[in-house]
């Protein structure tokens, strides 16, 4: 898209105008965007047209190569970081003479599968629709586009939008002959939607090149009320399936009831010993390692918009757990969720039978200072205290006869990782929040942590590098579902936010 070498000469030779105010950056970048809306959307649509499921290796590489070319066209030193068995990471490097800080921006270019049957248009045929649902011809876009229009395609919001917003912000700065105030790094992953199985190894293999003062995670939607959001942490996660056993085959409940142990009854009592109805985890020692929220985190949580009453109405809930605690306060605590229970049958399939086994699937959300290994140890000790003999595979007949109560525990090792949280008073993290608010021109939401889990701890690393999240997509974007979309105004806002982050001067 335009001005490829001019900026390199003017901005980095020291001839550019330095130190623009946040207002100047926002207004100038906005004017640039208004002049180039068709080109921006067309370039975005080109990227969205390439299928991008993480396991589709040929198309994943096509995505990576297009992104790499896109950044090289902006005079960003770009290469593909690769290790065996992993999709390439697109890594961009832009050093600024005199800059003392390095900031790395993360996004991912892979997307969820598109098996959902109710896509209005094909997921890899990007379609721009006006608010009334009518399509806009991408081949003949008007000079100015309705900001409430939406671009429909897989990964329009999750998570290719930050990539096109970043390159457009670079274009706008180049056109204005302004240079960034920090050294910039760009890290675009190709397997986030399948759990980032190679991320740890890749970060280790390229540790020297990836040294940075701050990571900015550009993924996810803004707050539900439309406010811009900056988050400072995520919860960790681990999960397991527990299977308990009764007779070695189903038994007639009339002939054997009150005599043969019922595994469904055993399982429900075991689960009841682990969690109460107010979300309190009853496993001894579970809270011993939990780091309590800091006063600054509690203050930030209290200042977040409280939409609990509306959410309750929307969800048809007359009560919530741990009343009167707010949703945001509860998200800073560990949690035990029972994902599902299987055993016997119900409805028309029900029979008067004592089942031979019953299984529960459980996930834990962890907070700082907790580790998956520590939680596993506590859970297994608790199960044993309840009288169970723990096995790792279905018991044979000898094991059944030797132990009156048996539990098979199967942990999810690949999907387990600790929590991560950057202090909300960290100067670099505060700088990000301040810039986002300046660019937004309105009060933003600062969240000490999100309720979900991503491997943010890998970016923190042993150096405890600050990590903050700056989600940019509209909250109603249908990510992971049919008709995923990005509201154009969210894209326009993202361009301004990135320009502000590139040019804002972090305090020491």
Give the location of each predicted region:
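Bacterial N-terminal signal peptides
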Residues: 4-15
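Acidic, glycine-rich active-site loops and adjacent beta-strand->loop/helix elements
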Residues: 109-111, 187-195, 218-223, 246-248, ...
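A generic structural motif
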Residues: 157, 248, 363-372, 417
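Acidic/His- and Gly-rich active-site-bordering loop/insert found
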Residues: 19-156, 163, 173, 178-182, ...
């Amino acid at each position: 898209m335009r001005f490829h070498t001019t900026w390199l000469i003017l901005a980095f030779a020291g001839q550019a105008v330095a130190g623009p105010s946040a207002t100047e950056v926002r207004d100038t970048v906005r004017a640039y965007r208004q002049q180039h809306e068709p080109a921006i959307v067309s370039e975005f649509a080109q990227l969205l047209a390439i299928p991008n499921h993480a396991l589709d290796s040929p198309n994943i590489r096509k995505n990576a190569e297009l992104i790499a070319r896109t950044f090289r066209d902006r005079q960003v030193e770009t290469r593909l970081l690769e290790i065996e068995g992993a999709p390439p990471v697109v890594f961009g490097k832009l050093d600024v003479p005199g800059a003392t800080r390095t900031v790395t921006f993360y996004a991912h270019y892979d997307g969820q599968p598109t098996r959902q049957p109710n896509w209005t248009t094909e997921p890899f045929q990007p379609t721009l629709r006006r608010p009334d649902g009518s399509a806009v011809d991408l081949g003949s876009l008007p000079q100015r586009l309705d900001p409430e229009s939406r671009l429909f395609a897989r990964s329009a919001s999750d998570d290719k939008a930050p990539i096109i917003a970043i390159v457009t912000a670079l274009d706008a700065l180049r056109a204005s002959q302004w240079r960034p105030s920090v050294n910039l790094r760009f890290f675009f992953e190709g397997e986030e939607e399948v759990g980032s199985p190679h991320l740890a190894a890749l970060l280790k293999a390229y540790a020297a090149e990836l040294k940075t003062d701050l990571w900015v995670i550009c993924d996810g939607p803004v707050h539900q009320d439309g406010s811009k959001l900056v988050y400072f942490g995520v919860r960790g996660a681990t999960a397991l399936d527990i299977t308990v056993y009764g007779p070695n085959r189903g038994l007639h409940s009339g002939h054997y009831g009150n005599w043969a142990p019922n595994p469904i009854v055993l399982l429900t009592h075991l689960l009841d010993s682990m969690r109460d109805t107010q979300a309190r985890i009853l496993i001894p020692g579970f809270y011993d390692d939990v780091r309590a929220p800091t006063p600054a985190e509690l203050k930030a949580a209290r200042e977040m918009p409280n939409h609990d009453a509306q959410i309750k109405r929307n969800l048809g809930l007359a009560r919530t757990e741990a009343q009167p605690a707010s949703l945001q306060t509860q998200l800073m605590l560990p949690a035990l969720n029972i994902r599902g229970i299987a055993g016997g049958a119900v409805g028309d399939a029900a029979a008067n039978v004592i089942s031979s086994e019953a299984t529960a699937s459980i996930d834990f959300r962890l907070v700082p200072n907790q580790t998956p290994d520590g939680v596993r140890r506590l859970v297994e000790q608790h199960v044993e205290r309840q009288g169970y003999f723990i096995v790792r595979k279905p018991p044979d007949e000898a094991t059944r006869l030797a132990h009156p109560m048996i539990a098979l525990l199967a942990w999810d090792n690949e999907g387990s990782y600790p929590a991560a949280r950057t202090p909300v008073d960290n100067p670099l993290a505060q700088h990000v929040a301040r810039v986002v608010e300046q660019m937004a021109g309105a009060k933003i939401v600062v969240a000490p942590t999100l309720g979900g889990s991503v491997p943010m701890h890998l970016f923190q690393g042993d150096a405890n590098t600050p990590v903050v999240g700056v989600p940019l997509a509209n909250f109603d974007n249908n990510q992971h579902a049919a008709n995923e979309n990005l509201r154009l105004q969210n894209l326009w806002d993202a361009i301004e936010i990135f320009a502000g982050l590139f040019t804002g001067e972090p305090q020491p």
